[in-house]
């Protein structure tokens, strides 16, 4: 969970998207690094009006942000590849404040498994993922 007062150095990964899979609304919210996620997290799939909770999610990426990113979980219920098409980079450096964020937009492909075991094939769902490093 996030907190009202963040530490001076904070780094997180976050991804979010909504589209359709098999003609039904599908969405996800995935993140790691923001706050204490040992007891709860923001990782969730949404499909056809129902939510499906995920555990810990990993973001595997290269230092060259335009290369594909892999997002997967510990339980084998999520395995997505983001193929970026645009890097929206923001950078702010003033005195001791030093913030940098790469928001990558592109297509997500792979699979997601719902609570009942249903496997969804994701094919080029347009969404984003970001890597933020903040010193504030």
Predicted stretch roles:
Residues 1-136:
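Structured soluble/peripheral alpha/beta segments that form catalytic or ligand/cofactor-binding pockets
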């Amino acid at each position: 969970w996030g907190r009202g007062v963040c530490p001076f150095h904070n780094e997180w990964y976050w991804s979010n998207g909504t589209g359709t899979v098999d003609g039904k609304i599908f969405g996800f919210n995935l993140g790691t690094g923001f706050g204490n996620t040992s007891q709860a997290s923001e990782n969730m799939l949404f499909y056809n009006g129902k939510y499906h909770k995920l555990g810990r999610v990993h973001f595997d990426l290269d230092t060259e942000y335009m290369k594909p990113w892999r997002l997967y979980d510990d339980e084998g219920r999520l395995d997505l590849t983001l193929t970026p098409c645009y890097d929206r980079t923001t950078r702010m450096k003033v005195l001791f404040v030093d913030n940098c964020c790469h928001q990558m937009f592109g297509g997500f492909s792979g699979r997601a498994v719902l609570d009942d075991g249903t496997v969804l094939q994701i094919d080029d769902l347009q969404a984003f993922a970001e890597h933020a490093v903040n010193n504030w």
